[in-house]
């Protein structure tokens, strides 16, 4: 049996948790700065109202982890299986962060904010994203399938490819220049005269 930690209102600077286990640990209103969570076991860990600034979550094992009101700033997540996180009260926001090969399928991300982020090859299947904002976010190779994107804001997002036949996009906002990404599924040619 391992001892679990309970920390509240703490600042953790340059913590190297790579390859370690934080299984069952609880962190409330903590600020993590320049921390490394690469290949860290986060099973059952709880991060409630926490901020992650310049942190690395490459290949972190997130099964059963709770991110509740968590904010990621200038952080990196590679292979983040967010769909394996605890779903009750799951809420995250990202600013200036890089997310590669992450999976947000089946999650309720209503109102989530991705601001000045890079989301490459990420998956949003059967995801609730109504009212979400993808401000100044690069969505290269990201898949949206059978997701609710109603009232979502893609006005300053780039490189998205969203099939309107398999996603709800009513009242979503898109820029005229990037709206071509809504037509790719129809295999048509757009000519600029």
Question: Which functions belong to the PLM regions below?
Answer:
Residues 1-193:
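Tandem repeat scaffolds
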């Amino acid at each position: 049996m391992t001892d679990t930690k309970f920390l509240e209102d703490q600042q953790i600077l340059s913590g190297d948790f790579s390859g370690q286990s934080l299984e069952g640990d609880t962190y409330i209103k903590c600020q993590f700065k320049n921390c490394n969570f690469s290949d860290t076991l986060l099973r059952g860990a709880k991060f409630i109202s926490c901020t992650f600034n310049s942190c690395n979550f490459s290949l972190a094992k997130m099964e059963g982890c709770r991110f509740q009101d968590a904010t990621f700033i200038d952080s990196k997540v590679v292979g983040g299986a967010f769909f394996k996180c605890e779903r009750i009260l799951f809420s995250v926001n990202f600013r200036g962060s890089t997310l590669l090969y992450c999976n947000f399928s089946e999650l309720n991300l209503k109102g989530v904010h991705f601001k000045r982020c890079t989301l490459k090859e990420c998956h949003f299947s059967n995801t609730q994203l109504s009212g979400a904002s993808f401000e100044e976010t690069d969505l290269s190779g990201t898949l949206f399938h059978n997701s609710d994107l109603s009232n979502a804001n893609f006005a300053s997002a780039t490189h998205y490819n969203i099939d309107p036949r398999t996603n709800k996009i009513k009242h979503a906002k898109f820029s005229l220049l990037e709206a071509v990404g809504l037509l790719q599924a129809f295999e048509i040619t757009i000519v600029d005269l």
